[in-house]
């Protein structure tokens, strides 16, 4: 079967793309405005031996894309007999509950409309839109979300939407996201189903998770046998061999705040900042950029990037 062709926007370091590639889709175009993210994208694909997208890596702002070039590439893929999909998660800080709530008129918020306009202009066979829970649950942002839905419906799309949590799918993080998917072909839309949940209906939160424990540098704690290890921070520390990773010693060195590094209890994520992970629990939502600091469970420092 011919692989569907994916045009990726707001690609970041490429994790959404990687998910599609793993499921047999072909990412043929990558658009990411932030150069460090795009460099990380290129590097990781090179390491994994994944060929570069045939229409290249594009660091143009989505607001400034040359429509004719994109249209030509979309048509080329369709003429090759391929289904074409647009995927993207526009920057979310303006809709985030923990952010500044500038909404659709914010510098980042307006890019959601730009992406939806792009979908309506180029009419891919399907599209995916991803954003934070605040776009779905906050009244003024929800009105904007519903307006975007009406626009893609008028363009001929049948829609599926769902507020999902990453932990439902086995990721060790409590991370809500609204997913909107649209299909031009109604027959194709009827085949779509929300599947793949490892822990559906909130079952991941029903285990007897630890809450907080006294912080102890390099302390040892055993996991309760009733807790699934794959949903725990420590499991992934060990699986990814973070202690021997190239960045293992490269952590943020604070000029102030060391006392808090030494006193916040393991698992105490009750504050907006200085949240200490618990080794035998999933992570709270990672939302860096809102002055968040996530502390290592049993070391006097922040976590490193592995």
Predicted regions, residues:
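Short catalytic/ligand-binding loop motif for oxyanion handling, primarily in non-cytosolic enzymes
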Residues: 17-18, 93-97, 135-138, 170-174, ...
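Short, well-ordered beta-strand micro-motif
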Residues: 87, 179-183, 287
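Short, P/G- and charge-enriched loop/turn segments at secondary-structure junctions
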Residues: 73-78, 166-168, 271-274
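Extracellular structured ligand-interaction cores
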Residues: 83, 175-177, 281-283
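C-terminal target-recognition/interaction regions appended to catalytic cores
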Residues: 233-306
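Core alpha/beta nucleotide-donor-binding catalytic domains of modification enzymes
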Residues: 2-123, 133-146
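Flexible, glycine-/basic-rich loop-and-beta segments that form/coincide
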Residues: 171-239
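Conserved Class I SAM-dependent methyltransferase catalytic core
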Residues: 108-183
